[in-house]
Structures are given as C-alpha cells and as structure tokens.
C-alpha cells in the first residue's frame, strides 16, 4: 500500500467516513478522479488474443502472459501501473462495449494483440467515445520507433525525407500505421504490398484500411509484386513474414538502401544476406543490431499523456515521441549499427514523456477541470 493504516484515524481517512468527502467531490466534478484515484497513473492493457506476437489467434488465456509482460515494462520503464485484461470477445462491438464500460477506472487504454482489420475500427470508435488516451501499440508503437530509426538512418545516408520512396511489406495493423506516420513526417511516397501485390487505387481484394492506404499512397500507381515495386526504392520496411525478399531485391533498390526487416521471429531478410548491400539494416530481434522495439515508445508516450492529463494521443504526440527517441542517439553514438537507442537506456522516457506532454498542450487535448 502507498498509504499506511496503523490506527483508527488512518482507517477513518482511508475508508469510511473520510472517503465520502472524496466521493462527493468526484461526483460533483468527475475530472477529479484523475487527481484523487488510481486513474492518474493506471492504464488498462486490453487484448482479445486474436493476433498475439507471431503466434496468431491463441485466445485470451494464451495472451495473458504477454499482457503481464507488457504491464511489467510499463512499470519498469515508465513508472505506469499497467493492468492486464484479456477478454473473451471476438467482434469489434464486444470489445468496444467492454472497454467503454471499464473506462472510468483507468487513465488510458492500451489495446494489444487484436487482429486487423477489427483493430482499426475498435481504436477509432474508442478514441471518439472516450475522454482518455486510447493507443493500439501494435500499430502506433511500431510506427513511432520505425520513424525514429528512419530519421537517424537518413543522417547516415544523406537522403532527405521528401525525396524517399518507401516500400512497406504487410498492410495490416503495423503497416498501415507506419504508412500514416511516414506521410505525416513528409515522406515522398509510400507503396504498400500485401499477399496480392502492390496496393493502389482501383485494385480489388482490399478491406477499408487498405482502401484508405490505396487512396493516400502510391501516387504513381505502381503495380506488381514486391520485387517489382522495390526496384529503385530507397527504403524497405517489412512487417509481414519470413524470407519475403532476397539480396537481389535489395540490390535493385536505389543507392544506399535502408532495410528494416521487422517480422518476428524470422525477418523478411536476414542481416547477413544484405551485408555490403544495405547502408542501414534493422530488425525486430534483440540478437541483431538496430532492434526496432515498441518498448522504446509506449512507456514514454503514456507517461507523457498521463502527466499532461491528456484526453487523446494525437499524431503530433506520436511525431514528438519519434523525434525524442531519435535524439536519444547522440552524434557520437550514431552509426549504421546504432540508429535506435538501447531499450535499457533509462533516459529515453525522460526525453519522450515531456516531449509528448508538450505536444498534447500544443494540440489542445489537455483535460479541462
């Protein structure tokens, strides 16, 4: 406990009759719940277990160890109390209804391991209906760290954001979010690929998320396979599956290519296959250099959002987090094998949280009391 209960006076303050004064104050001004209750530092980690790591749809019971691990990371790196909640809910309506009902207990909602395309609808509806931050980490945590790594990679290659063509393999939760944040950062063009091939306007076999992606990317309407659209591209970002591309594909890219092969546990191409071909290579694995890991993002993002008493997590807050993560790598440290900081760098949250909080103020999403 954070408050001692050693005598009758302590008990009367912690519970009845003293607690009634706090209850009445919150009844009259519900925003005070973010000041006087656990809401001020507690995030629900909600999953239905339909898209767990590389394991797939393993159900809520199977997902629980991942959510427990997430709670540990929230506390260890961000000082945030994360509460794992795995629910037996298959549809978007069920998940949205559940989260709306438990929202009064929490200061934020971290959605986790919910399959696409339902994850897009769930997050969108919850953001619209709740006055606390809602963040699908599989989408935005990955996107934020990817952008941070790309910014630092450009310092090495000398390329400019607005001149880049980026190919994204995998247009699911992470792929769509990466595309969005890259566009918001001023990227030249993005081309997404799924199992059918390149995403472009007018193509068939697309859900609503891919329809959005098609309408906002691939301005030249390139068609064909992943190998076709990689020709002349500056950056490859993989969030799909193992062994998807070859050394020949990387060789066909523009000069000084950047390759982020982030499929886990086995990347789209292994670093040893592009040694001497790629200027910068990153994966999602801890046993290779440049691990693009969400733990670099979500503790600081929620720490900043809670500290600011924010009601949402905006695109500006995500961009601020990406910049702060990128700047955690000093000029002296920056190298092709070190474009993202170590997850054990304890200064990252100290940089990310205030940057996110300041962005929340700029974007006007601070709770008014």
Where does each model-flagged region fall?
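N-terminal ligand-binding/catalytic initiation module
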Residues: 1-132, 353, 359, 363-367
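Solvent-exposed alpha-helices and their adjacent loops that cap or buttress functional pockets
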Residues: 34-39, 75-76, 101-103, 127-128, ...
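Short, ordered loop/turn segments at secondary-structure junctions
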Residues: 48-50, 58, 87-88, 113-116, ...
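Glycine-rich phosphate/diphosphate-binding loop of Rossmann-like nucleotide-binding domains
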Residues: 53, 58-78, 130, 136, ...
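General beta-strand structural signal in soluble alpha/beta enzymes
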Residues: 84, 110-113, 134-137, 168, ...
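Adenosine-phosphate binding glycine-rich loop
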Residues: 137-138, 157, 163, 261-368
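Rossmann-like adenosine-cofactor binding region
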Residues: 211-280, 285-287
